[in-house]
Amino acid sequence: VLIHGFGACKEHWRFNQKTISSIAPCYALDLIGFGDSSKPNSQISYEKKTYQNFNYCFDNWSQLVYDFCNEIVKKPVLLIGNSIGGVIALNTSKKLSQKALGVILIDCAQRTMDDKRLAEQSLLMRFLRPVIKTFVRQRLLSSNIFNIAAKPKFITKILKVAYPSGNNVDEELIDTLFKPTQSKGAPEAFRGFINLFDDY
C-alpha cells in the first residue's frame, strides 16, 4: 500500500505503482483532504466538534489506511510512505501489528514543528511559536497562504526542491498536484494540516 505525502495524491506514485504491480498487488489511495478524496472543513482541537468537520491528523489518516488494509487488501501488507505518508505508514503498522509485513520510508517527515520538539528550536522560534500558532488558526490567513501555494509555478518550485535532479517533474505531475487544489474544501484541508503542532 502506497501512502503519499503532504499536497500529493495517489497519482504521485504513477511510476512506482506500475513497477510494483508487476510483482505483487499494489494499491495507492488518496488520504482525506488530498487528491480526489473528500475535503471536509477542518476541526482544530480547541474548536467545537461537529460530525461534518474532520480533524486532519496522523491518527485519523492512519485509521483510514488501517481500515483500507482490513477491508480491501485483506492480507498481510507492506506499507510504503513518502514524507508524512511515512509517519502514517508507521502508525498504521502499529495498528496492523502482525498483518504489517514491513514499512518502507521514503524521505519521511521529521515533524520538526511538533510541540514535543520545541526545545530543539532556536530561541527566536520558541518565542514566536505561540504567535505563529495563533495566526495559522485563522481561516482568512490560512486561505491566503493556500492561495499563494496553490499555483502551478509555486508547485513547480517546490517539486524542484524535493526532486533536485528535475527528473519526472513534468506537466503531468504538476497538473496532478495542482488539480486537487482547485476542489472545494482544499483550503480547509491545508488549514487542518498546518495546524498539526502536537500529533505524533
Regions found by a protein language model. Give the residues of each.
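Active-site loop/oxyanion-hole signature of alpha/beta-hydrolase fold enzymes
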Residues: 11-14, 31-80
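Serine-hydrolase catalytic-loop signature spanning alpha/beta hydrolases and amidase-signature enzymes
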Residues: 5-15, 26
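Active-site signature of alpha/beta-hydrolase-fold catalytic machinery across serine-
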Residues: 15, 91-95
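The conserved beta1-alpha1 loop
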Residues: 3-5, 82
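Flexible "cap/lid" loop of the alpha/beta hydrolase fold
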Residues: 94, 100-143
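Conserved alpha/beta-hydrolase catalytic His-Asp/Glu region
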Residues: 139-200
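Gly/Ala-rich beta-loop-alpha elbow adjacent to hydrolase catalytic centers
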Residues: 81, 85, 89
